[in-house]
Curated annotation (Swiss-Prot):
Residue ranges of coiled coil: none
Organism of this sequence: Arabidopsis thaliana
Family (UniProt): Belongs to the glycosyl hydrolase 16 family. XTH group 3 subfamily.
Site (Important for catalytic activity) residue list: 110
InterPro entries referenced in this protein's UniProt entry, alphabetically: Beta-glucanase/XTH, ConA-like_dom_sf, GH16, XET_C, XTH
Function as written in the Swiss-Prot or TrEMBL entry: Catalyzes xyloglucan endohydrolysis (XEH) and/or endotransglycosylation (XET). Cleaves and religates xyloglucan polymers, an essential constituent of the primary cell wall, and thereby participates in cell wall construction of growing tissues. Required for cell wall modification during the development of tracheary elements.
Signal peptide: 1-20
Annotated xyloglucan binding sites: 112, 125-127, 135-139, 202-203, 207, 282
The protein's name: Probable xyloglucan endotransglucosylase/hydrolase protein 27
GO biological process terms on file: cell wall biogenesis; cell wall organization; phloem or xylem histogenesis; xyloglucan metabolic process
Keyword match Nuclease: no
Feature: compositional bias, Basic residues: 312-324
Positions of disulphide bridges: 277-290
Pfam families: Glyco_hydro_16 (PF00722), XET_C (PF06955)
Gene label: XTH27
Length: 333
């Protein structure tokens, strides 16, 4: 418990850092001016200030909303408080997509929050793909250094033409740099911002072992501090209407600083539980954008030597420490 507290303090000391510009200076948009309800009827509720939204999943339906504009690059953020108690099978998603415009070759940049059985933590999954390349998954999964059901925490996506960075409470947790070999697999078409809650019983918790139990419904996810800071664009003409301030921010946010990278490395070494870059059972050769970090690779090999080390399952020793002990972030820093 002491080492977990130390990790919490360590991460919070640097939570004010955002690549290239100060997040606290970005304007917060109201629901009425920037978003439209996607589905869910009365399961979406906008609070009186117009700047906080409640999404509900019950026996009837989930719910969600989408930005009015498409964007070609930008910084997108929301403070989110996740449902508590038994949440197995529940998926809360905060993501960019253009699936409504490009049904067969759409792009996505995803934050997905995967519920769990009682007394087990929510897990966070990030993913990207372009041109409908869902067969080439680029997923990563993580635990968090806090309980996301107790209070609001900030989740952010920075998307430029050269890279994508995911943030949790302003701490960078993942960077994807565009490579020539990626081709159309890097998201490059205008996208809208989506926020949803829905029933993912078939896959979200332990591969579908545990589904949504509506005895615990309604499941309520709360959102505030919604930020859309980017270049709105006509999805057909793809000509951006980008103000100079947003354009300057994108130019300034091209690289993670050495200090930020150090904090990202701490997060990934302690709290990452899956990365496609190290999944030898899935990809014999890592994809072109993967930068192999020896510390990350070693930790994941210890966690699952079959998946991350390429060791045949019949060679595994039957006695191992529990998976939880390896992924809960309580190791010494």
């Amino acid at each position: 418990m002491e080492t977990l507290s130390r990790l919490l303090v360590f991460m919070s000391l640097f939570s004010g850092l955002v690549s290239g510009f100060a997040l606290q200076n970005l304007p917060i948009t109201s629901f009425e001016e920037s978003y439209t309800q996607l589905f869910g009827d009365k399961n979406l509720f906008v609070h009186q200030d117009g700047k906080s939204v409640r999404l509900t999943l019950d026996e009837r339906t989930g719910s969600g909303f989408v930005s009015n504009d498409y964007y070609l690059h930008g910084f997108f953020s929301a403070s989110i408080k996740l449902p508590s108690d038994y949440t197995a099978g529940v998926v809360v998603a905060f993501y960019m997509s253009n699936g409504d415009m490009y049904e067969k070759n759409h792009d996505e940049i995803d934050f997905e929050f995967l519920g769990n059985i009682r007394e087990k933590e929510w897990r966070v999954q990030t993913n990207i793909y372009g041109n409908g390349s869902t067969h080439s998954g680029r997923e990563e999964r993580y635990n968090l250094w806090f309980d996301p059901t107790e209070d609001f925490h900030q989740y952010s996506i920075l998307w430029s033409d050269s890279h994508i960075i995911f943030f949790v409470d302003n701490v960078p947790i993942r960077e994807v740099k565009r490579t020539a070999e990626m081709g159309g697999h890097f998201p490059s078409k205008p996208m809208s911002l989506y926020t949803t809650i829905w029933d993912g019983s078939k896959w979200a918790t332990n591969g579908g072992k545990y589904g949504v139990n509506y005895k615990y419904a309604p499941y309520i996810a709360r959102f505030s501090d919604l930020v859309l800071h980017g270049c709105p664009v006509d999805p057909i003409e793809q000509f951006p209407r980008c103000d100079e301030g947003a354009a300057e921010d994108m130019r300034a946010a091209q690289e993670i600083t050495p200090s930020q990278r150090s904090k990202m490395d701490v997060f990934r070494r302690r709290l990452m539980t899956y990365s496609y870059c190290y999944d030898r059972a899935r990809y014999n050769v890592a994809l072109s954008e993967c930068v192999v970090n020896p510390a990350e690779a070693q930790r994941l090999r210890v966690y699952d030597p079959v998946r991350f080390g390429g060791i045949p399952r019949r060679h595994r020793n039957g006695k191992h420490r529990s998976k939880r002990s390896r992924v809960d972030g309580t190791e010494s820093i």
